[in-house]
Amino acid sequence: MDAFKLLTRATKLKTGATPSSAQSSTRLPSTGKAENPQLFRNSEAEKVLEQAQQGKKRKRTAAAEARDADDDAAELNFFGARKAAVSSTPTSKEEKQEQERSGEDDASDEEVEFMDEVQRRTVLNAHKIKVTDLRDLEEIQPVRVASEEPKKKKKKRKQQEEEESKVPLTKKEQKKARRLYPEPLVSFKELRSKYKISSRLAENIAEQGFTVPTEVQLGTLPLLLGGFESKAGESVEPDLLVVAPTGSGKTLSFLIPVINKIVRHHHDQSQEQERGIFSIIVAPTKELASQIVNEGRKLVHGTGVKIALMKKGMRVVEREDEDDDGDDSSSEDGDESSESEHEERPIAKKSKGKAPVTKSDILVTTPLQLVNALSTNQTKPMATLPLVRNIVLDEADVLLDPLFRDQTLNIWRACTHPELRASLWSATMGSNVEDLAKSTIKERKEAVNQTKSYPLLRLVVGLKDSAIPNIEHKLIYAATEQGKLLGLRQLLHPTAASASDVRLRPPFLIFTQTIPRAVALHSELRYDIPTEAGGSSRIAVLHSDLSDGQRSEIMKNFRKGEIWILVTTDLLARGVDFRGINGVVNYDIPNSAAVYVHRVGRTGRAGREGGIAVTYYTKEDIPYVKSIANIIDVSEKLRGKTGEKSIQKWLLDALPDLSKKDKKELKKHGVKARQSNLKSDKDDKEHRKTRISTKSGFERRIENKKKALIAANRNRKSQAQSAADGDSGNESWDGLEN
């Protein structure tokens, strides 16, 4: 008997409307993956996709239909006996062979039907996917004439030149000429039937549970798997620039085509041909590179493709000038050699040779590690990578920023294969990155004497440089540093207040501007979680000053759920995929709008609803907040949020605009009051205001006195010890006294 039903039978409460069910209806990112990972969709596009799927069905044999019926029954019978699942699998060799044969028939005999242009437009526009050809108009226009008006080929050249010179295209016509509507991907099953990817790769994708493609996968996978037709009518792989929201599946989008291309290459090449690095994936941080390798290993299982993470001491290319240096190394001192050379010397003595060159097909690396490997720690000219046919820049806007630009371009230029294809991926990409990519591709084309022309396409999902619309944004004024600390503690220990208050459940990330501030905030919060819940072990800090082992251990514990709150810098702001994070706290405002987009993108991954992004700002931050407020406003409009907005119009009007000079200064150094290298007395006073601590000045003075006394005592002891050692050394032995 339900006591709640019995007590509320005279009320108007609906059945099942219990408090527990009301609370459970609020879905969080940590509760599991979303039913549909797509961010943008409507009923018209879904109808078109359903029609496309129905049009591709073909007649199946009776045995195949019976086998499918058995599989469906086994899947739907969640509470059935274990024997049902075992009986559905083939037991004899003949049944297994027939199943493999039928699987091949499904891929080869299935009638492939393509959408018409109206259907393609409907689907791409509904999912807010925009594909643009970035080549010069002189290269685009002949393609249009050849494909749309084949009858006009018979005209004379002079008449065609006159017609083209008479009417110059307007900006609107130029945009229309550049706009493309390629075939979208309806489901992951099409990868095998329509694009003929490896059967083993298709099985690995299915085992990971991928069924519905996200917007970026829906648009990019057909292009990268040969779905773009060139001027001659043949399918080619274009150079691609992709701008897609955080957590939308960009890693899977570039891994599948790269792996499939290598599988085909291994199948076509002779066994005698030497294997080497076929594709390079460059990422800005070690955490992101390690994550890409982990995802890649799941996809390459059983395909014969090897993926490796770049490490110190790894040799990626055979250099001709290494032999001469190897002979002289025994006579020279080894102080100037790198860590990799130290690791290789014992091997060289034992086996009379060097460490073997890596045979991995895909190499995932950070820029500096690969540059050091190719240039012997920048002591020799860069070696070339003639076998590399794909270079992928993940988080391309950072890799082509001044910090990594020279290293990234050196790697790009070292790939000398004439058929090299480049793809750049990020959630934020400025026009300067596009211009740099275009100029680099053009420069390579001239350097390699490339005769064949490849298209350069840009694919944008949603609004460019905007935050994901499936999370809630909160911009909170805290006035002072103590106000921010108080607000953060209220998140950790929520009280029974109004429903409008922010409630954030662990796990979540806290971002700070600098490493000292992250360490100070961690030491301030480490005892805020009671010992019954795990105490200080539930809070950790992660930054670049930690060793690689410490960083990987913290990441592992955070993914396992042993750490609930992770205080970090912008080290984890990009690319790292924590699927169950319920929210992000910007304790310090980000240095730019792009950094805000990437920070808040750590939650709401793969379409998960319920994520929260909280940003605290103080009086010192007011000049820099408007760009963040604009992003939040655009995100809410994109979401279609009704009712009261978190960013009011009066706030947008009141916040001051930031000049270009101030934007550059903020991007380089952050808010001046929080910089750790302040020197003047005036700046030091501002720095004291932004100190993360709840200790009073009196307590801090006592601590400083204790530290000074301890340091003075140590100095006095060391001086006395050194004086005693000096006196004993100066004394001479006069012999034994009588």
From Swiss-Prot:
One of its GO terms (cellular component) is cytosol. Belongs to the DEAD box helicase family. DDX52/ROK1 subfamily. Its EC number is 3.6.4.13. It catalyses: ATP + H2O = ADP + phosphate + H(+). This is ATP-dependent RNA helicase rok1. Residues 487-655 form the Helicase C-terminal domain. It is found in: Nucleus, Nucleolus. The lineage of its organism: Eukaryota, Fungi, Dikarya, Ascomycota, Pezizomycotina. One of its GO terms (molecular function) is RNA helicase activity. CDD domains: DEADc_DDX52 (cd17957), SF2_C_DEAD (cd18787).
